[in-house]
Amino acid sequence: MTIPRNLSILAEYAGTVNAPVLNLTNAGEVTTVSATAATGTINYDVITQSVLYYTTNASGNWTLNIRGNSSTSLNTFMATNQTVTIAFLVTQGSPAFYQSALTIDGNSITPKWQGGTAPTSGNASAIDIYTITVVKTGSATYTAFASQTQFK
């Protein structure tokens, strides 16, 4: 049996499910690698990738805008009680910069940061990985959990 590389499955259930719906031994995630410098507003399209990696040194602080894609809002893409986790990898030079704001579908959201405090700087000559988990709790209502991790 040949399984298509980009296989999408939608399963709907009536009643109670007592067993895991899906067990994965190994799953590959789509990564977009771009020779782009982080600055300004960066649109993160969850329909396109799970990981976005900017390989050119950041040139200014940025706002990360999470959305479905340019024509689909995250609100439309996600159902209430669904969660999506994304990773944004940012190459840093000296000076380093940081994510100064988070928006979802262009609307400001204050994430809950690991350790309780939002970053106020990037890490010079490193790669900073911003991991954000978004939980949709209602129509256009979200809770976001975020972290910044330095890699050298």
What are these regions (language model features)?
Residues 48-54:
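Short carbohydrate-recognition loop motifs
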Residues 57-152:
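Acidic, glycine/polar-enriched metal-coordinating patches/loops
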Residues 1-47:
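Intrinsic low-complexity, repeat-rich intrinsically disordered segments enriched
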